[in-house]
Curated annotation (Swiss-Prot):
Gene3D superfamilies: Phosphoenolpyruvate-binding domains (3.20.20.60), PK beta-barrel domain-like (2.40.33.10), Pyruvate kinase, C-terminal domain (3.40.1380.20). Homotetramer. It comes from Drosophila melanogaster. Enzyme of the glycolytic pathway. Glycolysis is essential in glial cells but not in neurons; neurons rely on the citric acid cycle for their energy needs, and on lactate and alanine secreted into the hemolymph by glial cells to fuel it. Pathway: Carbohydrate degradation; glycolysis; pyruvate from D-glyceraldehyde 3-phosphate: step 5/5. SUPFAM superfamilies: Phosphoenolpyruvate/pyruvate domain (SSF51621), PK beta-barrel domain-like (SSF50800), PK C-terminal domain-like (SSF52935). This is Pyruvate kinase.
Length: 533
């Protein structure tokens, strides 16, 4: 996904020069890295998508418009917080902001809306009958975790309620229990009929309704909670574009979500959030069954050792790249910017390395939901993505992806040919005329250096295209012409006009055009290289 924003200036390049030109033609990974230049011109267009979580700091129409102008592509609603009424107002504001921003651009600018489910989770009960009371746990002390509902609102230094009734059957002595995002750790010493006797390993202040993690323990929580079902049906009513499904452990969970979405929600994309060891072990079946993956590093960093999260991230992204499924990298990417206007150098490297790993999108959470500098966060992320995209060794990645493609159909072969043609011709863009989006998504898989302009008449297809690296989705609203070839040509011209208007296509540039030989989805097999007039 891409769009050109108010901050994207055309780079000053010589004829046939590309950003990081010296590195682009390297023969080895080491040589490629040696040739990277810190003062290379920045690409004109960002190819990675930016997901922004909408909250109190960003939910106004005015702020949403500014975020779109700065680079937001997908608006995420976190259903761990807020009522349906609150989220309905957010959806309405996003759509109003899209209308306002589109009017300024002179064409419809698609922005996707994502519903992030709360998911099945384990939580503690109330401390001392209050939502605000806390207890101080100290290292070496003993505390009981109980499933006895008598203690639901009577948590104390001696005993605290947890809402997972089967915990005594899955946890063994020696297992660790993490509470409150891993800030407090307990070691299980004894397992009783309805309680665990634990020793405090790392103490701290424990409040009410805090999350509980059981790293390495195969839990049997329902894939979709009653709250999730209600939220999913709300999402169908609101016509959201995608679901970010929390704590997905296997492919069966996706089948259950699909059943809840029903016929009316059959076209909603499901992005599986991998947040525990079970999800990692079943990753291949989850990728195959779903529409994409989110590397949800928050809970994942509690469920597995923190020093192994980068391995999980690289494995998830690579497998998604190989399968041609979109992948989002999330959690604490610019965390310090919740309070500060500038990121740490480590955070910039984190964003850049997610792009270099192959992520299609990067995500902001609290940074835009509750932070003091939401616009600065989006701009920082957008600028970092562009630098990283230019530094990627595209030719090597393309060759690896082609080698792993196996036997392919005609439209898939056309996608590979289009990317190779664009590279050889130094094309400014690839224009794809698409109905379902499939042909554009296939081109995206092979990671061209240039933007992919995906022209479609279907608004939801355009919005969902933001999940994929490199796509500039455009909605063509004019009715179809009787002559198929003329109808294709006017849509191609529309794509070229938008590219010229945004400055990344110029007169005399080469552009690769990918179309179908007849009307409908699944007939894409024609490639042309045209010179822009």
């Amino acid at each position: 996904m891409v769009n050109v924003t108010i901050y994207d200036e055309a780079p000053q390049l010589k004829p046939n020069e590309v950003p990081q030109n010296m590195a682009a033609g390297a023969d080895t990974q080491l040589e490629h890295m040696c040739r990277l230049q810190f003062d290379s011109p920045v690409p004109h267009v960002r190819l990675s998508g930016i997901v922004c979580t909408i909250g109190p700091a960003s939910s106004s129409v005015e702020m949403l418009e500014k975020m779109m102008a700065t680079g937001m592509n997908i608006a995420r609603m976190n259903f761990s917080h807020g009522s349906h009424e609150y989220h309905a107002a957010t959806v309405a504001n996003v759509r109003q902001a899209v209308k306002n921003y589109s009017a300024k651009l002179g064409y419809e600018h698609p922005v996707a809306i994502a519903l992030d489910t709360k998911g099945p989770e384990i939580r503690t009960g109330l401390i001392g009958g209050s939502g605000t009371a806390e207890i101080e746990l100290k290292k070496g002390e003993k505390i009981k975790l109980t499933t006895n509902k008598e203690f639901l609102e009577k948590g104390s230094l001696e005993i605290v309620y947890v809402d997972y009734e089967n915990i005594v059957n899955v946890v063994k002595p020696g297992n660790r229990v993490f509470v409150d995002d891993g800030l407090i750790s307990l070691i299980v010493r004894e397992v009783g009929k309805d309680s665990l006797t634990c020793e405090v390993e790392n103490g701290g202040s424990l409040g009410s309704r805090k999350g509980v993690n059981l790293p390495g323990v195969p839990v049997d929580l329902p894939a979709v909670s009653e709250k999730d079902k209600s939220d999913l049906l709300f999402g169908v009513e609101q016509e959201v574009d995608m679901i970010f499904a929390s704590f997905i452990r296997n492919a069966a969970a996706l089948t259950e979500i699909r059943k809840v979405l029903g016929e009316k929600g059959k076209n909603i994309k499901i992005i599986s959030k991998i947040e525990n060891q079970q999800g990692m072990h079943n990753l291949d079946e989850i990728i195959e069954a779903g529409d994409g993956i989110m590397v949800a590093r928050g809970d994942l960093g509690i469920e597995i050792p923190a020093e192994k999260v980068f391995l999980a991230q690289k494995a998830m992204i690579a497998r998604c790249n190989k399968a041609g499924k979109p992948v989002i990298c999330a959690t604490q990417m610019l965390e310090s910017m919740v309070k500060k206007p500038r990121p740490t150098r480590a955070e910039i490297s984190d964003v850049a390395n997610a792009v270099l790993d192959g992520a299609d999108c990067v995500m902001l959470s609290g940074e835009t939901a509750k932070g003091e500098y939401p616009l600065e966060c989006v701009l920082t992320m957008a600028k970092t993505c562009k630098e990283a995209e230019a530094a990627l060794w595209h030719q090597n990645l393309f060759n690896d992806l082609v080698r792993g493609a196996g036997t392919i159909d005609a439209s898939h072969a056309a996608a590979i040919a289009a990317v190779e043609a664009a590279t050889k011709a130094k094309a400014s863009a690839i224009v794809v005329i698409t109905t379902s989006g499939k042909s554009a998504f296939q081109v995206s898989k092979y990671r061209p250096r240039c933007p992919i302009i995906a022209v479609t008449r279907f608004a939801q297809t355009a919005r969902q295209a933001h999940l994929y690296r490199g796509l500039v989705p455009l909605i063509y609203k004019e009715p179809g012409l009787g002559d198929w070839l003329k109808d294709v040509d006017v849509r191609v011209q529309f794509g070229l006009q938008v590219g010229k208007k945004n400055g990344f296509i110029k007169t005399g540039d080469s552009v690769v055009v990918v179309t179908g030989w007849k009307q409908g989805s699944g007939f894409t097999n024609t490639i042309r290289i045209v010179t822009v007039e």
